[in-house]
């Protein structure tokens, strides 16, 4: 628990003081956001606001994680050090963040809202996602556990194992599955990042949920994962430290990103956070639960899919005034802050529901008994 507080605190400090320094650098070089002309007219006042703030978030997370482990090794050497699972989570986050950085830089250099091509972005994300998918199935620990498995997971691995098709085809199917998750999460966070503080606040809630999930898993590991209520998860405590660092860094960034935003996270931040989200789903064996815990991101993404699909099928008609969903409410006259706070509430309810499902599953596997219930008899 001390490590979690340390990681969150360090992430907060690094971010809240590092972000204004980044703002000055970006402003000095004229690295400001270019606003779409077809977006809400109220957004034109945001033109020129420094972007690429995701650099501050991602670097703060990495720094908080490393410093936490440095202090832990010196103070409590028995707690263990940096793990492969933690590094893989950070690696996917940084890899996707780098794609976002290239996208942001191209927009800035062209001085218009046109970054990497869709095909170019897909190739880069696919390469990074594929590398992650392969790595998580190798490098077993002393007990023979790899960071992830080829089984589709809900609150734990299910009986559906992609390895049924054989080692080669199973690996290919798993790579495709992980890329679907990573593509979905990166695009979902990117679409949500349309109002000041919206994606930042929602991400704080989602990663707080994952911090609690992995912390719970760390307390309920067992040698035989087939036993009731045990979790076959590798290095969950270290994943919880990464999640805590993310929460702290995002809170620090929100100080500057709340309305009126002094800086935007840009694609650097949204794609990086999406990568981290995908990593947690795969490494904590909660891939399908991701749809619930990140429910706000899913709803906003679905609003775009429905809008585009209906527009094509109806030859020009629309379901919403504008997509993503947050812009629909803007055009209905809602204030930006009102939309953001209400969407945060919705995000929090999704996270709470996911935690309820996760804990409910544990109770079912534990025969319905609460921890320590035997002490009451």
From Swiss-Prot:
<feature type="transmembrane region" description="Helical">
    <location>
        <begin position="236"/>
        <end position="256"/>
    </location>
</feature>
<feature type="transmembrane region" description="Helical">
    <location>
        <begin position="162"/>
        <end position="182"/>
    </location>
</feature>
<keyword id="KW-0479">Metal-binding</keyword>
<comment type="similarity">
    <text>Belongs to the glycosyltransferase 4 family. MraY subfamily.</text>
</comment>
<keyword id="KW-0961">Cell wall biogenesis/degradation</keyword>
<dbReference type="InterPro" id="IPR003524">
    <property type="entry name" value="PNAcMuramoyl-5peptid_Trfase"/>
</dbReference>
<dbReference type="Pfam" id="PF10555">
    <property type="entry name" value="MraY_sig1"/>
</dbReference>
<keyword id="KW-1133">Transmembrane helix</keyword>
<dbReference type="InterPro" id="IPR000715">
    <property type="entry name" value="Glycosyl_transferase_4"/>
</dbReference>
<feature type="transmembrane region" description="Helical">
    <location>
        <begin position="263"/>
        <end position="283"/>
    </location>
</feature>
<dbReference type="GO" id="GO:0051992">
    <property type="term" value="F:UDP-N-acetylmuramoyl-L-alanyl-D-glutamyl-meso-2,6-diaminopimelyl-D-alanyl-D-alanine:undecaprenyl-phosphate transferase activity"/>
</dbReference>
<keyword id="KW-0472">Membrane</keyword>
<keyword id="KW-0808">Transferase</keyword>
<comment type="function">
    <text>Catalyzes the initial step of the lipid cycle reactions in the biosynthesis of the cell wall peptidoglycan: transfers peptidoglycan precursor phospho-MurNAc-pentapeptide from UDP-MurNAc-pentapeptide onto the lipid carrier undecaprenyl phosphate, yielding undecaprenyl-pyrophosphoryl-MurNAc-pentapeptide, known as lipid I.</text>
</comment>
<dbReference type="InterPro" id="IPR018480">
    <property type="entry name" value="PNAcMuramoyl-5peptid_Trfase_CS"/>
</dbReference>
<dbReference type="GO" id="GO:0046872">
    <property type="term" value="F:metal ion binding"/>
</dbReference>
<feature type="transmembrane region" description="Helical">
    <location>
        <begin position="288"/>
        <end position="308"/>
    </location>
</feature>
<protein>
    <recommendedName>
        <fullName>Phospho-N-acetylmuramoyl-pentapeptide-transferase</fullName>
        <ecNumber>2.7.8.13</ecNumber>
    </recommendedName>
</protein>
<keyword id="KW-0131">Cell cycle</keyword>
<dbReference type="GO" id="GO:0008360">
    <property type="term" value="P:regulation of cell shape"/>
</dbReference>
<keyword id="KW-0812">Transmembrane</keyword>
<dbReference type="Pfam" id="PF00953">
    <property type="entry name" value="Glycos_transf_4"/>
</dbReference>
<dbReference type="GO" id="GO:0008963">
    <property type="term" value="F:phospho-N-acetylmuramoyl-pentapeptide-transferase activity"/>
</dbReference>
<feature type="transmembrane region" description="Helical">
    <location>
        <begin position="82"/>
        <end position="102"/>
    </location>
</feature>
<keyword id="KW-0132">Cell division</keyword>
<keyword id="KW-1003">Cell membrane</keyword>
<feature type="transmembrane region" description="Helical">
    <location>
        <begin position="2"/>
        <end position="22"/>
    </location>
</feature>
<keyword id="KW-0133">Cell shape</keyword>
<dbReference type="GO" id="GO:0009252">
    <property type="term" value="P:peptidoglycan biosynthetic process"/>
</dbReference>
<feature type="transmembrane region" description="Helical">
    <location>
        <begin position="343"/>
        <end position="363"/>
    </location>
</feature>
<keyword id="KW-0573">Peptidoglycan synthesis</keyword>
<feature type="transmembrane region" description="Helical">
    <location>
        <begin position="195"/>
        <end position="215"/>
    </location>
</feature>
<feature type="transmembrane region" description="Helical">
    <location>
        <begin position="55"/>
        <end position="75"/>
    </location>
</feature>
<keyword id="KW-0460">Magnesium</keyword>
<dbReference type="GO" id="GO:0051301">
    <property type="term" value="P:cell division"/>
</dbReference>
<comment type="pathway">
    <text>Cell wall biogenesis; peptidoglycan biosynthesis.</text>
</comment>
<dbReference type="GO" id="GO:0005886">
    <property type="term" value="C:plasma membrane"/>
</dbReference>
<feature type="transmembrane region" description="Helical">
    <location>
        <begin position="122"/>
        <end position="142"/>
    </location>
</feature>
<dbReference type="GO" id="GO:0071555">
    <property type="term" value="P:cell wall organization"/>
</dbReference>
